[in-house]
Amino acid sequence: MRMLLALLALSAARPSASAESHWCYEVQAESSNYPCLVPVKWGGNCQKDRQSPINIVTTKAKVDKKLGRFFFSGYDKKQTWTVQNNGHSVMMLLENKASISGGGLPAPYQAKQLHLHWSDLPYKGSEHSLDGEHFAMEMHIVHEKEKGTSRNVKEAQDPEDEIAVLAFLVEAGTQVNEGFQPLVEALSNIPKPEMSTTMAESSLLDLLPKEEKLRHYFRYLGSLTTPTCDEKVVWTVFREPIQLHREQILAFSQKLYYDKEQTVSMKDNVRPLQQLGQRTVIKSGAPGRPLPWALPALLGPMLACLLAGFLR
C-alpha cells in the first residue's frame, strides 16, 4: 500500500508527457481554460545558460571585421509560398528554395521557414531588444547549414551553429509596405491553427530592407526561442528596423487565433529576455562613407595642377 501511495505521489509531482509538450505563451494561459506550460516553466534545454532572445547593448558589442555583407541566393525569385497558422505563429514554408552565405557564416545555409512574433502594442512585440527597446514585431528567417560542411567530427556531432536565423525588427511607419501585402492578405484565410493557404506570388527579397541597411547587424550564439530551445543557433539581428503600416501590424493580432474556437487572439507570442551570461555580442563594421558627389569633379583638376607643377 505504501509503495502504491509513493508511486501516485511521484506521478502527481511530475507533469505528464502531453503537458510538457503543450507549451504556450503567457497570454494563452491567462485567456484560455486549458492547462499549458508558460515560458518560465519550459523545461529541458530551455533552462540552459545560452538561450535566446537577449537584450543587445549596442555600445558593448565589439566590431568584427569578418562580419561582411550577406549573399542571398533565390531570395529574388517570385514564388507562390505556402503559409500556415501553426498555433503559435504564422509560418511561411521556404522548402530550401533560397539560401544565404557570407556575413561571417561558416558555410552556406538553406532557407527552411519564416515566421514572426508580434503584439498589438508597438513596444512589446519583438523578442530581441536593442538597448532595452522592444519593437512592434520581429521576423525570423530560419536557415539550416548545408550538410557535410562542419569543420570537424566534434562540431558535426554537437554543432552550435547548425541553424542560422536572420532576425529583423519591425516598427510602425506611415506607409504601407507593399512587399508584405501578400502575406498580410493571406492571414484572413488561416485564422485557426492547422490552417494553411497559398500566398499571392512574391519574393523573399520583397520582405527585406534595402541592401545598404543589411550591412549593419549584431551576431551572437544562442538558441531557438521556442521549445525545444536547442542551443545551436547563430543569430544575426539587423540594426535597422523594417517599417510596416500600423494597420498591417495590427492585422496579425486581429485575424489570427491561438485556438480553433477563435476565442484567443494570437498576439504577444514573445519569449521573455534571457541572460547573456558569458557570451559575447559582436557587430559588423560600418562601411566607409562614399565621397560626396562633387568631390571627384574637384579632384581631377587639382591632380592635373599638381602633376603640371611636378613636371616643370
Swiss-Prot record:
A GO CC term assigned to this protein in UniProt: apical plasma membrane
Tissue expression from the record: Expressed in the endothelium of the choriocapillaris in eyes (at protein level). Not expressed in the retinal epithelium at detectable levels.
EC numbers, comma separated: 4.2.1.1
All copies of domain Alpha-carbonic anhydrase, residue ranges: 21-285
Membrane topology: Lipid-anchor; GPI-anchor
Active site, UniProt feature: 88 (proton donor/acceptor)
Compartmental location: Cell membrane
Positions where lipid (GPI-anchor amidated serine) attaches: 284
Keyword rRNA-binding: no
Keywords associated with the record: Cell membrane, Disease variant, Disulfide bond, Glycoprotein, GPI-anchor, Lipoprotein, Lyase, Membrane, Metal-binding, Retinitis pigmentosa, Signal, Zinc
Propeptide segment residues: 285-312
UniProt-recorded name of the protein: Carbonic anhydrase 4
Cysteine disulfide partners in this protein: 24-36, 46-229
GO terms of molecular function: carbonate dehydratase activity; zinc ion binding
Enzyme class: lyase
Family label: Belongs to the alpha-carbonic anhydrase family.
Amino acids binding substrate: 225-226
Organism: Homo sapiens
GO biological process, one term: bicarbonate transport
The protein's assembly and partners: Interacts with SLC4A4.
Function description: Catalyzes the reversible hydration of carbon dioxide into bicarbonate and protons and thus is essential to maintaining intracellular and extracellular pH. May stimulate the sodium/bicarbonate transporter activity of SLC4A4 that acts in pH homeostasis. It is essential for acid overload removal from the retina and retina epithelium, and acid release in the choriocapillaris in the choroid.
PANTHER family: CARBONIC ANHYDRASE, CARBONIC ANHYDRASE 4
Disease: Retinitis pigmentosa 17: A retinal dystrophy belonging to the group of pigmentary retinopathies. Retinitis pigmentosa is characterized by retinal pigment deposits visible on fundus examination and primary loss of rod photoreceptor cells followed by secondary loss of cone photoreceptors. Patients typically have night vision blindness and loss of midperipheral visual field. As their condition progresses, they lose their far peripheral visual field and eventually central vision as well.
Gene3D superfamilies, alphabetized: Alpha carbonic anhydrase
InterPro entries per UniProt: CA4/CA15, CA_dom, CA_dom_sf, Carbonic_anhydrase_a-class, Carbonic_anhydrase_a-class_CS
Binding-site residues, Zn(2+): 115, 117, 140
Pfam family, one: Carb_anhydrase
